UniProtKB/Swiss-Prot annotation:
Residues 1-24 form the signal peptide. GO terms for molecular function: potassium channel inhibitor activity; toxin activity. It comes from Tityus obscurus. Reversible blocker of both Kv1.3/KCNA3 potassium channels (high affinity) and Shaker B (mammalian Kv1.1 analog) potassium channels (very low affinity). This is Potassium channel toxin alpha-KTx 18.1. GO terms for biological process: envenomation resulting in negative regulation of voltage-gated potassium channel activity in another organism.
Length: 61
């Protein structure tokens, strides 16, 4: 029964993660997104980079 509970928790975490997009925003005086920093931040979250525009870095869900 515990194993089934763990599986249900993992599945629900995966589904919730797929509905909410993660955003990584660099702090500091920079006003433009740097692709290398954005990609490194997304990799730190275990995701790949989706886009880097303006001052917003988006990671793929």
């Amino acid at each position: 029964m515990r194993f089934t509970g763990i599986i249900l928790i993992l599945i629900s975490m995966t589904l919730i993660d797929s509905f909410f997009e993660m955003k990584v925003e660099a702090t500091g005086p920079q006003t433009t997104c740097q692709a290398a920093m954005c990609e490194a931040g997304c990799k730190g979250l275990g995701k790949s980079m989706e886009s880097c525009q303006g001052d917003t870095c988006k990671c793929k869900a």
